[in-house]
């Protein structure tokens, strides 16, 4: 298929994931038409307009078409790994103990600062390829392992280059307020000053960040410190996101909502008030079962409270070297169902429509609607539930990015 190709996918079943459609918006005996990288028709094949009769046809053999999957929370660009910390945790050390002993995020900072931009791209591509192989068409990538201006810029530039190396959409997030670098000697206020006055202006000037994130936790930054970063992001007209309530309830979810954040992520310790605040603000709850599983957390995010409040829920891998070295969004869906008791529809919507909402790109992708990008995943399955049910099996038949297979 060429960039300006016109293609009809015939003999398909289509899960449109439209907002108010029941049963994932499933259409049997359907066709989907792509023209100039956009969806121009998605509906019953017997109602296909005659104007598309001359288009190239691809017979889907009754396979299921969904929106291309979206991994809306990753730390994909990093250097090295932290397998040694994994061994420590198996021996009983907690995430906090590893971090306070100089491990955790700070060890990844040392590795990233020593790596070149080319090194980072080279090391990250295999992780990205693993996601792409499962039908992923959009990936969010955070910085946050540089923690100084040049290293954060290096990370974000490496992330943007991923989208040049592969047919995938990359959304970049500046996560300067991720951890306190060792050279700050515990002075968090001075470091936040650097984030606000040194890093963020340079990153904003170069247009390297689609969003600004922070880690609101006792071992990272407190709500008043995060608020300073968010105020600065607002001044630069950059939307915000937040790692919130992962290890304790500092009311990070409510803080994120108060800034109209695109999303608040993790949320194991979020309370009902936080869920309600997020629903009112339209802030998406991005749940990260890979991290929950990997650090053997026991506190589950309040899925029932999110449902009751009407908070939208997304799922993501949280790929990172310390707490979620996970590169499978299919497994993430299974974890969302088995660990968090999310429904099949919630899981599939969570890696398509709601993931797009969490990135502020629902107007472009995430559902199969006329005018949206032709980002598709075509699956060799009989029931949508198989995407969530199977473990260690990839039923992807074809992946389509901007209309191209």
Curated annotation (Swiss-Prot):
Task: Give the GO biological process terms.
Answer: L-histidine catabolic process to glutamate and formamide; L-histidine catabolic process to glutamate and formate
UniProt-annotated binding residues for Zn(2+): 73, 75, 243, 318
Localization in the cell? Cytoplasm
Q: Does the keyword Hydrolase apply?
A: yes
Question: Where N-formimidoyl-L-glutamate is bound, by residue?
Answer: 145, 320, 322
Q: Which InterPro entries match?
A: Amidohydro-rel (IPR006680), HutI (IPR005920), Metal-dep_hydrolase_composite (IPR011059), Metal_Hydrolase (IPR032466)
Listed pathway(s): Amino-acid degradation; L-histidine degradation into L-glutamate; N-formimidoyl-L-glutamate from L-histidine: step 3/3
Which positions, given as ranges, span the membrane?
A: none
Q: Which cofactor does it need?
A: Zn(2+); Fe(3+)
Domain of life of the organism encoding this protein: Bacteria
**Cofactor, free-text remark:** Binds 1 zinc or iron ion per subunit.
The positions annotated for binding 4-imidazolone-5-propanoate are 82, 145, 178, 246, 323
Q: Does the keyword Ribosomal protein apply?
A: no
Single annotated GO MF? iron ion binding
GO CC terms: cytoplasm
Q: Keywords assigned by UniProt?
A: Cytoplasm, Histidine metabolism, Hydrolase, Iron, Metal-binding, Zinc
Q: Where does Fe(3+) bind?
A: 73, 75, 243, 318
Enzyme Commission identifier(s)? 3.5.2.7
Question: What SUPFAM superfamilies does the annotation carry?
Answer: Composite domain of metallo-dependent hydrolases, Metallo-dependent hydrolases
The reaction(s) annotated as catalysed by this protein in its Swiss-Prot or TrEMBL entry are: 4-imidazolone-5-propanoate + H2O = N-formimidoyl-L-glutamate
Q: Which family does it belong to?
A: Belongs to the metallo-dependent hydrolases superfamily. HutI family.
Function as written in the Swiss-Prot or TrEMBL entry: Catalyzes the hydrolytic cleavage of the carbon-nitrogen bond in imidazolone-5-propanoate to yield N-formimidoyl-L-glutamate. It is the third step in the universal histidine degradation pathway.
Q: What is the protein name for this chain?
A: Imidazolonepropionase
State the species of origin: Brucella ovis (strain ATCC 25840 / 63/290 / NCTC 10512)
């Amino acid at each position: 298929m060429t960039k300006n190709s016109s293609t009809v996918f015939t003999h398909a079943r289509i899960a449109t994931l439209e907002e108010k459609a029941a049963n994932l918006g499933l259409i049997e005996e359907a066709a989907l038409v792509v023209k100039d990288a956009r969806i121009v028709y998605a509906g019953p094949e017997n109602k296909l307009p005659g104007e598309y009769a001359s288009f190239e046809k691809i017979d889907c053999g009754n396979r299921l078409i969904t929106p291309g999957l979206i991994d809306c929370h990753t730390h994909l660009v990093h250097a090295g790994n932290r397998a040694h910390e994994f061994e420590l945790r198996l021996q009983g050390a907690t995430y906090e103990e590893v971090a306070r002993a100089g491990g955790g995020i700070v060890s990844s900072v040392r590795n990233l600062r020593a790596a070149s931009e080319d090194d980072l791209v080279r090391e990250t591509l295999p992780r990205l390829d693993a996601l792409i192989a499962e039908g992923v068409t959009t990936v969010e990538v955070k910085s946050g392992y540089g923690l100084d201006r040049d290293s954060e810029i290096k990370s974000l530039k490496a992330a943007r280059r991923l989208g040049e190396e592969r047919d995938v959409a990359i959304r970049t997030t500046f996560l300067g307020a991720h951890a306190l670098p060792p050279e700050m000697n515990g002075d968090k206020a001075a470091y936040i000053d650097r984030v606000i006055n040194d890093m963020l202006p340079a990153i904003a000037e170069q247009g390297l960040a689609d969003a600004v994130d922070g880690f609101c936790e006792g071992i990272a930054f407190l709500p008043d410190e995060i608020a300073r970063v968010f105020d600065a992001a607002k001044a630069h007209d950059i939307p915000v996101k937040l790692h919130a309530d992962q290890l304790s309830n500092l009311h990070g979810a409510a803080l994120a909502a108060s800034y109209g954040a695109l999303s608040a992520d993790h949320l194991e310790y979020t309370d009902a008030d936080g869920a309600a605040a997020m629903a009112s603000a339209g802030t998406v709850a991005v749940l990260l079962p890979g991290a929950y599983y990997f650090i053997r957390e026991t506190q589950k995010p309040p899925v029932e409270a999110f449902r009751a409040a009407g908070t939208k829920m997304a799922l993501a891998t949280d790929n990172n070297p310390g707490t979620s070295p996970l590169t499978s969004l299919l497994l993430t869906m299974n974890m969302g169902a088995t660990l968090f008791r999310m429904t099949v529809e919630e899981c599939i919507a969570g890696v398509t429509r709601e993931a797009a909402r969490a990135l502020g790109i629902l107007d472009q992708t995430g559902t199969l609607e006329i005018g949206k990008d032709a980002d598709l995943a075509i699956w060799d399955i009989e029931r949508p539930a198989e995407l969530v049910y199977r473990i260690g099996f990839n039923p992807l038949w074809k992946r389509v990015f901007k209309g191209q297979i």
